[in-house]
């Protein structure tokens, strides 16, 4: 099985982890978003040292490419691309909405609605097995009302979310479920489903500054 390096800087809490033989062998988190650029390489060195590995032992890099913090996404992906280029190893990008969905244990269809800005959300729907039903998109809260009528369970990080009463709140900065990420990363690695290093970009889903209002 491959040795995989994981980087997530899509939220204010940065996470770096290593997996071997399907298990997390080292993980570091850092809670200050303003320091991500300064500490990311230190975190990478720390997990490598804990696992008694060097970058030469890493077979591929997995990065949460968003949606999320614009600055964080650029920091994480640029670091991952730099390492992948220098070490000539594959790069795999993952969508944060999918990563959260894969970590759920639901028996019903559900939706992920992460707060983008006030009354704006990064949104996607999933089957009861966690399979994506519609592509992640940026929507205003009123655009979610038709989905609420489908009796979907909304999983959201916004305590003020009001499009549906059928909701479950998660911490906006919770650490992603590494077990489910590892399963999907190792499957992609075995199938050689890698991203193009030269053309890989963050999954922004929306412009950096949104002035549109539907009110």
Where are the regions that the model predicts?
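N-terminal beta-alpha supersecondary unit
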Residues: 1-63, 175
